[in-house]
Amino acid sequence: IPHLYVPPITKVEAVHGFSYGSGATIFPQALAMGATWNKNLTEKVAMAIGEETLAAGTMQAWSPVLDVAQDARWGRCEETFGEDPVLVSQIGGAWIKGYLSKGLFTTPKHFGGHGAPLGGRDSHDIGLSEREMREIHLVPFRHVIRNYACQSLMMAYSDYLGVPVAKSKELLRNILREEWGFDGFVVSDCGAIGNLTSRKHYTAKNKIEAANQALAAGIATNCGDTYNDKEVIQ
């Protein structure tokens, strides 16, 4: 926002390295890092990624992935640290610690339950009970929010109990903020708010309704074109 002297926040995925530019180090995928069970090594890898990311002029990393992979058919298992919530919590926490030590914004994702889509179909209904969600899939997020100064968090594409996470006050307000005390900002996964107007969810007739639903749930930053649509802004 130039007239307010508010600079842009530049970001990168950085799931296993600063992948948006040539010359950066590409480290093993998260699943391989999880298999080491080595928090010290993981922290050092994250520190190296943090240095290279900041050197490139980027201040925010959309990682680590704290999804607990529960279905081998899911095509994004390699982005996760594994199938055990304790392992994901510990390795994910070490990763965040490494980022923060270098001054890099960290954005753990995808909150919540993204690692258990029905039939292994990415981004679809996760079909989890409240107990499964709380005792398995929310554990890593609760751990890092309570133990590290995470500045932001990315929500998931999925539905939970029939409600898209992009408009879920239960997940994004009641649990995340009121129960856990998270005081950072929530980023939408790319296109997730726009999906509220599509056949995938169809809880909104247009972008204005979609934006209102997402804002009411507590999503501050939109990866996509909904929040910056002219009609929405007006």
For every predicted segment, state its role.
Residues 1-234:
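Glycoside hydrolase catalytic-domain context in secreted enzymes
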